[in-house]
Structures are given as C-alpha cells and as structure tokens.
Amino acid sequence: MKIKTLAIVVLSALSLSSTAALAAATTVNGGTVHFKGEVVNAACAVDAGSVDQTVQLGQVRTASLAQEGATSSAVGFNIQLNDCDTNVASKAAVAFLGTAIDAGHTNVLALQSSAAGSATNVGVQILDRTGAALTLDGATFSSETTLNNGTNTIPFQARYFATGAATPGAANADATFKVQYQ
C-alpha cells in the first residue's frame, strides 16, 4: 500500500513538472530597430562613421574670444570615403551647408539656441586641409583631394570664431555636407 501511494505521488509530481515544461512560450514586443543608409552611384561611399559625427570643441575662455576675428585652437575631424574607384573619379571635394551667423560672416556657422543660454558673438568655422575657412552655402567646395583606390580620408578642422566680444554659454552648431567627385 505504501509503495502504491509512493508511486502515485511520484507519477503525479512527474506529470506536473512535464506539464510546466510544456507550457506555451510567451512573446512580448521588444522595440524597433531602424536601418538607415543610402545606395549611391558614385566613385566612393561615405563611411558610416563620417555620416553623423560630433566634433568636441571643448571649453574656450571668453578672454580668448574677446574681439572680432579671434579664434580658438582648431580641432581636427575627418570625412572618410570607402570603396573608392579611381576609374570613376580621381578627385573629391566637400561642401558644407549651415546657417551663417550673419551676412558679413558667411564662413561662420551660427550657434543653436539653448534653453540654458547660448554664447553670443561667436560661431564655428570649418577649415579645409589648406586652412581656408569654407563658405557654408553648400555650393562652395573645399580644395580637391586626389583619390586612391580603396579608403580615403579628407581632413578638416573646426574652431570658434569671434564676431565681437564673446559672452559665455552653450556653443553648438550643425552643418550638413555633400561630396563632389571629379
């Protein structure tokens, strides 16, 4: 009798555990994955790391930007081109587009307004590899870079440029760019 009771208890326990193991899987929504890119018919493809980048200009004292024409130290950044084919084009140049600080400074990006307060009398300049400040109209291209087959890097620099005595605050600016192949 004890063996029969023990067998019933063991069989009951096994059937309960197998029922739990056979329980239906639970599926929940996890989120969204965005895939973003572009297929281009060009001599090169802009590297994904160059498409959307942030250049850290750091903190600069207002005393360094106390008068019109004063600049901060320049910070380098690159636009990398991949899978270049020199049979298609042998040179590349880049144009930047952004809002100029004013009509007299078409090569100085205006700062974005900030809830915390933006710096005034200062903007951002973009310099090509020759050190020339680029006009930010999207149509004035940098000096040309001779392409090699494969990967190419086009160097630029950015710096703050004072249009008067700078006041403190956030100093962020944005520009888009396009590449011209010849």
Curated annotation (Swiss-Prot):
Q: Does the keyword Disulfide bond apply?
A: yes
Pfam families hit by this protein: Fimbrial (PF00419)
Query: Predominant location of this chain?
Result: other
Molecular function per GO: identical protein binding
Q: Which SUPFAM superfamilies match?
A: Bacterial adhesins (SSF49401)
Any GO BP annotation: cell adhesion involved in single-species biofilm formation
Q: Name one GO cellular component term.
A: pilus
May I ask which residue range the UniProt record assigns to the signal sequence? 1-23
Q: Where in the cell is it found?
A: Fimbrium
Q: Sorted alphabetically, which keywords does the UniProt record give?
A: Disulfide bond, Fimbrium, Signal
List all disulphide bridges recorded for this chain.
Answer: C44-C84
Q: What does this protein do?
A: Fimbriae (also called pili), polar filaments radiating from the surface of the bacterium to a length of 0.5-1.5 micrometers and numbering 100-300 per cell, enable bacteria to colonize the epithelium of specific host organs.
Which family is this protein grouped under?
Answer: Belongs to the fimbrial protein family.
Q: Which PANTHER family match?
A: FIMBRIAL SUBUNIT ELFA-RELATED, FIMBRIN-LIKE PROTEIN FIMI-RELATED
Supply the name of the protein. Answer: Type-1 fimbrial protein, A chain
* Name of the coding gene: fimA
